UniProtKB/Swiss-Prot annotation:
Interacts with HORMAD2. Interacts with IHO1. Disruption phenotype: Mice develop normally without obvious somatic defects but males and females are sterile. Although spermatocytes are present in testis tubules at epithelial cycle stage III-IV, they undergo apoptosis by the end of stage IV, and post-meiotic cells are not found in testes, suggesting that spermatocytes are eliminated at a stage equivalent to mid-pachytene. In females, ovarian development is grossly normal, eggs fertilize and embryonic development arrests at blastocyst stage due to aneuploidy. PROSITE patterns: HORMA. GO terms for biological process: blastocyst development; homologous chromosome pairing at meiosis; meiotic cell cycle; meiotic DNA double-strand break formation; meiotic recombination checkpoint signaling; meiotic sister chromatid cohesion; oogenesis; regulation of homologous chromosome segregation. The modification Phosphoserine is found at S375. This is HORMA domain-containing protein 1. Phosphorylated at Ser-375 in a SPO11-dependent manner. PANTHER family: HORMA DOMAIN-CONTAINING PROTEIN 1 (PTHR48225:SF1). Keywords: Chromosome, Cytoplasm, Differentiation, Meiosis, Nucleus, Oogenesis, Phosphoprotein, Spermatogenesis. It comes from the Eukaryota. Residues 25-227 form the HORMA domain. InterPro entries: HORMA_dom, HORMA_dom_sf, HORMA_MeioticProgression. Plays a key role in meiotic progression. Regulates 3 different functions during meiosis: ensures that sufficient numbers of processed DNA double-strand breaks (DSBs) are available for successful homology search by increasing the steady-state numbers of single-stranded DSB ends. Promotes synaptonemal-complex formation independently of its role in homology search.
Length: 392
């Protein structure tokens, strides 16, 4: 019975992430699935759609939720259609970046409260990862096993981060913006379900914090995920789990092209491997959260003998210890609920000061965005942006 269950779990895992990635087509299918899993995990753990909008899959022994079309949940069905449009642009090698944004005012989708940035890279011969070994005839040394382990590590990071962020407001909306490699994308191209859009005047509602969640390389693609969220949603996280260094970054950097410049001012989101030995026969035992570290990232420099940006030791430990993540529904569906430590009078005063600070931040960012856009018009060509024809 146990053997049959293990075989079933392995087959379900292979359905999500194939065991072998040796062709460009296999890599494309892998990246599509990784994007679907990432978006599904984020929306599930942030409680954006109801439970019925998700199916269940397994990555090794990690259970993940996959978004599906549900006629009783128009929002989830709409997001699935957006994903199909992303697949079209990805398959044509046009897609450069996806920004999935959360906003709270249905009449103002340009003022966002949280966003997730997915980036893809290509070469003229097709998509290829960043890390190339010069002494191997320009062929990547990344194996399928490395890619799969990096993928599971990324999903684990998403789980840990989403579980520990403060909850979103009860009523939120989603929007999506697609950016392209304009030099190869036809000027009249639009993915199914999308139309011409722009990112001018986009502002962040609050004080943003930036996190580099991670990236997954294949022999043909590089998939990268970054998160921008309200700083206050991180302030209540246990300091032993998440340790941010003070770093001020303007919101406009989310739209930058050059990763080596952009990454200098973002925070790394690293999982430290501080784990206890487990009983060999312990199945789904009670689990502890791994320590997280949010620190300023240095400019990446890849030496000739250097492996991809994931540590083999770190990945091996994390992949083999799946029970270190708590994926209980009570914690993941709505975020942690933090109790205020202030008395009523002080709490009311604190809320007023927070509102005043947010108002001043919004006014400041509106001014900054306007100045930056006007000053860059003569230097930078305006990039094409697509947005959904219908919002959730």
């Amino acid at each position: 019975m146990a053997t049959m269950q293990l075989q079933r779990t392995a087959s379900l895992s292979a359905l999500v992430f194939p065991n072998k990635i040796s062709t460009e087509h296999q890599s494309l299918m892998f990246v599509k699935r990784l994007l679907a899993v990432s978006v599904s995990c984020i929306t599930y753990l942030r409680g954006i759609f109801p439970e019925r909008a998700y199916g269940t899959r397994y990555l090794d022994d990690l259970c993940v939720k996959i978004l599906k079309e549900d006629k009783n949940c128009p929002g989830s069905s709409q997001l699935v259609k957006w994903m199909l449009g992303c697949y079209d642009a990805l398959q044509k090698k046009y897609l450069r970046m996806i920004i999935l944004a959360v906003y709270t005012n249905p009449g103002d989708p340009q003022t966002i409260s949280e966003c997730y940035q997915f980036k893809f890279k290509y070469t003229k011969n097709g998509p290829i990862m960043d890390f190339i070994s010069k002494n191997q005839n320009n062929k990547s040394s990344t194996t399928s096993a490395d890619t799969k382990k990096a993928s599971i590590l990324l999903i684990r990071k998403i789980y840990v981060l989403m579980q520990n962020l403060g909850p979103l407001p009860n009523d939120v909306c989603l929007t999506m913006k697609l950016f392209y490699y304009d030099e190869v994308t036809p000027p009249d191209y639009q993915p199914p379900g999308f139309k011409d859009g722009d990112c001018e005047g986009v502002i962040f509602d609050g004080d943003p914090t930036y996190l580099n969640v991670g990236e997954v390389p294949t022999p043909f693609h590089t998939f990268r995920l970054k998160v921008t969220t309200e700083k206050e949603r991180m302030e209540n996280i246990d300091s032993t789990i998440l340790k941010p260094k003070e770093s001020k970054t303007q919101f406009e950097k989310i739209l930058m092209d050059k990763d080596d410049v952009e990454d200098e001012n973002h925070n790394n989101f690293d999982i430290k491997t501080k784990m206890n030995e487990q009983n060999e026969n312990s199945g789904a035992s009670e689990i502890k959260e791994p320590n997280l570290d949010c620190k300023e990232e240095e400019t990446m420099q890849f030496k000739k003998s250097q492996s991809p940006s994931i540590s083999h030791c770190q990945v091996e430990q994390l992949v083999s210890k799946t029970s270190e993540l708590d994926v209980s529904e009570s914690k993941t569906r709505s975020g942690k609920i933090f109790q205020s430590k202030m008395v009523n009078g002080n709490n009311q005063q604190g809320q007023t000061s927070k509102e005043n600070r947010k108002r001043s931040l919004r006014q400041f960012r509106k001014t900054v965005l306007h100045v930056l856009e006007s000053s860059q018009e003569s230097v930078l060509k305006k990039r094409r942006v697509s947005e959904p024809k219908e919002h959730t």
